[in-house]
Amino acid sequence: MKIAILGGTGDQGFGLALRLAKNNKIIIGSRKKEKAEEAAKKAKEILKQRGIEADIIGLENKDAAKEGDVVILSLPYEYTLSTIKQLKEELKGKIVVSIGVPLATAIGDKPTRLLFPPDGSVAEMVQNVLKESKVVSAFQNVCHAVLEDLDNPVDCDILVCGNDEEAKKVVIDLANQIDGVRAIDCGNLEKSRIIEAITPLLIGLNIKYKSKGTGIRITNLEI
């Protein structure tokens, strides 16, 4: 499967690229092709040191969106709306994974505080713009440092929600490829309001306890 990660040069997107490259072709997207190519080269070198010959390329966001079977939006909240409005045609009919969180850093405030999007959540905002795409919300509660630590499994459940059952299953299967992850179907896209709100809490715990990256596990749940 071809996975395009728009904004894949950032920490979260880069970590996902490393974790998903074992079984998929990864297309790292950026506003500048040169920056995307540099990130792709770096990711390939990291994985090659571990004996993995990964298929990773770098493209501008528009071309990456066009190429991907599944497109992951790894974009700061403040740039998400403007970016997806420019890519509506490229994203038409595709599975689009929203991993964004409306952190107050978008307005110069603390990352432990949350903004409240008019649509209810980042994922719902994306779906309301990309009406012909299948938007799935996932990966908000896993820290980039944990994703990039390839020496250890990812000790975190991935909470997934969306309105299209088939698209949601694709994303759940994708998340379950990551060593240590258990992906959980949490229901329709509205649940992203709750899932996104967990992230600033986790960031606060990381700061308070000097953790490299807290995660979340749902206990007493057999799936």
UniProtKB/Swiss-Prot annotation:
It catalyses: reduced coenzyme F420-(gamma-L-Glu)(n) + NADP(+) = oxidized coenzyme F420-(gamma-L-Glu)(n) + NADPH + 2 H(+). It comes from the Archaea. InterPro entries: NAD(P)-bd_dom_sf, NpdG, P5C_Rdtase_cat_N, STEAP_metalloreductase. Coiled coil: none annotated. Gene3D superfamilies: NAD(P)-binding Rossmann-like Domain. It holds the Pfam family F420_oxidored. GO terms for cellular component: plasma membrane. GO terms for molecular function: 8-hydroxy-5-deazaflavin:NADPH oxidoreductase activity; coenzyme F420 binding; cupric reductase (NADH) activity; ferric-chelate reductase (NADPH) activity; NADP binding; oxidoreductase activity, acting on NAD(P)H. NADP(+) binds at residues 9-12, 30-31, 35, 75, 101. One of its GO terms (biological process) is copper ion import. Its EC number is 1.5.1.40. Keywords: NADP, Oxidoreductase. Belongs to the F420-dependent NADP reductase family. Catalyzes the reduction of NADP(+) with F420H(2) via hydride transfer, and the reverse reaction, i.e. the reduction of F420 with NADPH. Probably functions in the regeneration of NADPH required in biosynthetic reactions. NCBIfam families: npdG. This is F420-dependent NADP reductase.
